[in-house]
Regions:
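Bacterial N-terminal signal peptides
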Residues: 7-17
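Glycine/tyrosine- and acidic-biased, solvent-exposed loop/turn segments at the edges of beta-strands
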Residues: 18-505
Length: 505
């Protein structure tokens, strides 16, 4: 260190007529250490205090010397200048209790020294003052009983050392004092059976260790004592088929492992033991076809996996018949054409998907394969023209959707292709004049809708355009109506006639 020499005269003792320095504070550059004896620049053994500083001139240590030998209590400091430890020395060797501190000055460790080595019980402390750990030492080597504690002071663990290594039985405790674990050490490694417990005292897991490594079947238990899992270990890694059970004791899962990751067959089960789901793993990722089953054993779904992601054509089946649906997936998202089938195996619908949502044309078919409806979707929502068809392919109706809502004019046709109705929609409700036509195109009748309900006068016409009837509506209810003979001779309608008129519009 490049430090300026600095001496502080603490006092002196006169021996005869020669003044001899009895106490100084020495800097590092003022001294030299030879065979364990500290000498000053004049070659005299140091008696006084010896200081060492960090490069920023913050004190690093302050050590007491008598005749060049450490004697008394020395102190160590961190780079902030805060004391870290007090070390007692006798004749150049640590002797007594060394104290180590937290930065705020609270006690962190008490270390017993004898003849320069740790001897006795070393204690470490939490910042709240409670003991954290007690470890027995013999000539710097851990030997004998040891204990660790929770921050509230309750016992956490009891174990022992021999020749510096953990040896023999060890017990770990919960905060409340109940046993959490029981295990054994040999030469600092776990050997034999290791048992883990619930707070109730019931066994939670059991595993055998060989040379510090898990070997054999680890058995996990529910708190009521029922088996939860059997997991095979070899050289500290899961190897082979693990089995996992439900709380009622029935088998839930079996999974094959290699080097502690899933590799090979994995299955889920119904309560009666039949396979519910079967998949295959490679390097912890699903690969190949994942098959789901009904309880009857029939295939329910088939999903293709590549490196843990669904890619390809997925299929869903009816329990008692055949294919129900086919869907193409790209990176676990539906993309492309999806096909849907009825229980007779006939195509019932096909739709296009993009980014997991319906997007584009959907077509619906009857049992004979004839087109019955055609619609358009944008991001899973009806949007655009919607058409229905008769069996012969003629248009039955047309409608318009905007963001899933009926908007605009819906047209309905008869089997001959003639316009039968014009129905205006606003925000999914009939709004405006609904018109009905004869097959020849003549107006048969018209009525006004307000907020989805018939309101006002309905006029019905003969083919020649003369009035056939007039009916007054109020909020979808026919109040009164008259039949007319080509616009003449009104006759009050019966309740039954009003009902028929209401149904027709």
């Amino acid at each position: 260190m490049n430090l300026r020499p600095f001496c502080l005269l603490l006092g002196f003792v006169l021996l005869g007529t020669n003044p001899v320095l009895a106490g100084y504070t020495y800097k590092e550059d003022d001294t030299r250490l030879v065979n364990g004896v500290l000498y000053d620049i004049n070659g005299d053994p140091v008696t006084g205090t010896y200081e060492v500083f960090y490069e920023n001139n913050i004190r690093k240590s302050l050590m007491p010397y008598v005749n060049g030998i450490l004697n008394g209590v020395g102190s160590l400091y961190n780079e902030k200048g805060v004391k870290e430890a007090d070390m007692p020395f006798v004749d150049g060797k640590a002797e007594g209790i060394a104290l180590v501190y937290y930065e705020d000055g609270r006690l962190k460790e008490k270390i017993p020294y004898r003849n320069g080595k740790i001897n006795g019980v070393m204690r470490t402390f939490f910042e709240n003052g409670n003991v954290k750990e007690r470890i027995s030492y013999d000539a710097d080597v851990r030997s004998g009983p040891a204990k660790s504690y929770y921050e509230d002071g309750s016992l956490k663990e009891v174990y022992a050392y021999a020749d510096g290594k953990k040896e023999g039985a060890a017990t770990v405790y919960f905060y409340d004092g109940s046993v959490a674990e029981e295990l054994r050490y040999s030469g600092d490694i776990i050997v034999g059976e290791r048992n883990v417990y619930y707070k109730s005292g019931n066994l939670k897991s059991r595993i055998l260790y060989e040379f510090g490594r898990k070997n054999g079947n680890m058995q996990n238990y529910y708190e009521d004592g029922k088996l939860a899992a059997v997991i095979p270990y070899k050289d500290d890694k899961i190897e082979g088929e693990g089995a996992f059970y439900k709380e009622d004791g029935t088998l839930d899962l079996t999974v094959n492992y290699k080097d502690s990751i899933r590799d090979g067959a994995a299955k889920a089960y119904y309560p009666d033991g039949k396979v519910k789901l079967a998949a295959n793993y490679q390097n912890d990722l699903k690969n190949g076809t994942e098959t789901e089953y009904f309880e009857s054993g029939a295939v329910k779904t088939e999903m293709p996996y590549v490196d843990g992601i669904v890619n390809g054509v997925g299929r869903e089946y009816y329990e008692t018949s055949g294919l129900k649906m086919e869907m193409t997936y790209v990176d676990a998202v539906a993309n492309g054409t999806a096909k849907f089938y009825d229980q007779d195996g006939k195509l019932s619908a096909e739709a296009n998907y993009k980014d997991g949502k319906k997007d584009g044309t959907q077509k619906d078919y009857d049992k004979n394969g004839r087109l019955v409806a055609e619609s358009n979707y944008v991001k899973d929502v009806l949007d655009g023209e919607y058409k229905e068809f008769y069996e012969d392919g003629k248009v039955k109706s047309t409608a318009s959707y905007a963001n899933g809502i009926l908007e605009g004019l819906t047209l309905v046709y008869d089997t001959a292709g003639n316009l039968s109705y014009e129905i205006p929609y606003v925000n999914n409700r009939k709004e405006g004049k609904v018109k009905r036509y004869y097959p020849g195109g003549e107006l048969m009748g018209e009525v006004t809708y307000e907020k989805g309900k018939k309101h006002g006068m309905l006029d019905a016409y003969n083919k020649d355009g003369t009035l056939m009837a007039k009916v007054l509506f109020n909020k979808d209810e026919a109040i009164k109506g008259y039949s007319l003979n080509h616009g003449k001779d009104p006759v009050l309608m019966s309740e039954e006639e009003l009902k028929l008129i209401n149904e027709a519009y």
